[in-house]
Amino acid sequence: MRIGVVGLGKAFMLMLPTFLMDRRVQLVAASDTDPLSLRQFKADFPAAAVHGDIESLCKNPDVEVVYIGTPHQFHAVHAEIALNAGKHVLVEKPMAVTLEDCCRMNACAQRAGKYLIVGHSHSFDHPISRAKELIDSGRYGRVRFIHSMNYTDFLYRPRRAEELNTDLGGGVVFNQASHQLDVIRLLAQGRVVDVSSYLGRWDAARRTEGAYSALIKFDNGVAANVTYSGYAHYNSDEVMGWVNELGEKQPERRLFPTRLRLDEVLNKGSEAAYKNEMSYGRGWSAHGLPKMARNHQHFGHLVISCEGADIVPKAEKIEVFANGEYHCENFSMPDFPRQEVMDELFDAISGTRPPVHTGEWAMETLDLCIALLEGGKPELIGMRATAVACAGRSSGR
């Protein structure tokens, strides 16, 4: 797969190990507004082309797939440019910040006959796929209830101003619920019919959502409760064996150091400037990547309650507590991080298997994120997406 990268920011930096280790992938082009990032890309990939804008990148005949890792508010326009140029698109979550944007993106994909896949999301993770396989086997009866929780330091990592502005896709709902709700939807296998939510906005200096809790009901009778906090107090990696979200083993750390580090940054200057200093082409390159994690990625503690068992996926194993019996299946080390994303993209393009994480799928996840932000008005669930639905219903061929 010949990939052109649009946006050389943090999302790209997290995907870079995947691109480098997947033999099916060739990075052939990049575009960004930062000349230092483009210079670093050219140094890391001498045979690749660099472009000052997405329009010129999409005219490059070597580009087969466009990976979009730009800020959330630009996802829609960048995806439309790429799709209209006849490129397949892999766009980071959230797909966009409005349902109308999602609608236009899906319509472009259908007209172009190209695939629009949204990821990385933690619903791609192997432990989640394995849990779904156990559910689908019917061995433990139907899913009845799902519990998901994650306590992190998300809100106190250095941020640009837009990342603390909900209207521009900032805050933990657009950034983190888009992971958590994707996982819940994949496992529940129903359509959401009711949501009750509570939002936490507890820091006047960071005036966006830092936490949420919600009860979600599906049309097949499944109920799920989800809780997330990014306020950098309790670290729920404790219940994941001190394996962090990226699958890296961490020292036992009862308290996050993130708030203290942010105070140090703010005392010296701008957190946006500090974050920029750690970006690709400044603090990062393809030759200075950390060692590969030895576990699968995860998104916190998850319990799937079926009629005959509780299923608990973790980063290194999956546990089943079934009517007095305990089963444990250890996972082998992943070949490379986020392999599942590239497998789905490759299988779609090659015609091997239709994708799961299409634009339509991601649009429904965004609909649920918006429901959380609006307080879960039950009469709106599923109706917003219908009201702005595209004439076409397929994200690609």
Curated annotation (Swiss-Prot):
Keywords of the record: Aromatic hydrocarbons catabolism, Oxidoreductase
A GO molecular-function annotation: oxidoreductase activity
GO BP term, pick one: catabolic process
UniProt-listed Enzyme Commission number(s): 1.-.-.-
Classification via PANTHER family: BCDNA.GH03377
Family statement drawn from the similarity comment of this UniProt entry: To P.putida PHT4.
Name recorded for this polypeptide: 1-carboxy-3-chloro-3,4-dihydroxycyclo hexa-1,5-diene dehydrogenase
Record organism: Comamonas testosteroni
UniProt lineage: Bacteria, Pseudomonadati, Pseudomonadota, Betaproteobacteria, Burkholderiales
